[in-house]
Design a protein with these regions (language model features):
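Cytosolic regulatory regions of ion transport systems
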Residues: 1-138
Length: 138
């Protein structure tokens, strides 16, 4: 199985360190310095370039990819990458959502989304009110 992760951030490092060794991993980022300093406990392919370019995605192995995860801080970039992936018959799409108003755009592509604001609020809710069973976040 192969995954392309767009955005060489802390979340990407944490994910790479957590997923099983059965995954072949490519990380794409525009920033060469970020990639140079991006280290994990796994062998990964690092690609410097614009992930909204089909050529860059193909260099990362898009044709043989099982999943694409976008973690950039720019929803426009994330959505464009996911559109290209979907056009190439990749259906395991996931992304961080930076602006809640863009959530429907991700879902319309069939992407699984993570909304950091909701995750943080839910975690702090459990810290403040640990005995509550039902969360107001649902």
């Amino acid at each position: 199985m192969k995954v392309i992760i767009v955005g060489a951030h802390g979340e990407a490092k944490e994910l790479i360190n957590r997923i099983s060794s059965g995954w072949s991993i490519s990380v794409i980022d525009l920033d060469q310095d970020k990639l140079r300093n991006f280290s994990t406990n796994r062998q990964i392919e690092k690609i410097q370039g614009d992930a909204t370019s089909s050529l860059v995605l193909k260099k990362a192995g898009l044709e043989s990819t099982t999943a694409v995860i976008t973690l950039t801080l720019n929803d426009e970039v994330n959505l464009e990458v996911l559109k290209i992936a979907k056009q190439n018959d990749i259906f395991r799409l996931s992304s961080v959502v930076n602006e809640a108003s863009n959530t429907d755009s991700y879902k319309n592509l069939g992407a699984e989304v993570v909304e950091p604001d909701i995750l943080l609020a839910r975690r702090f809710e459990h810290i403040l009110e640990p005995r509550r069973v039902v969360s107001q976040a649902f």
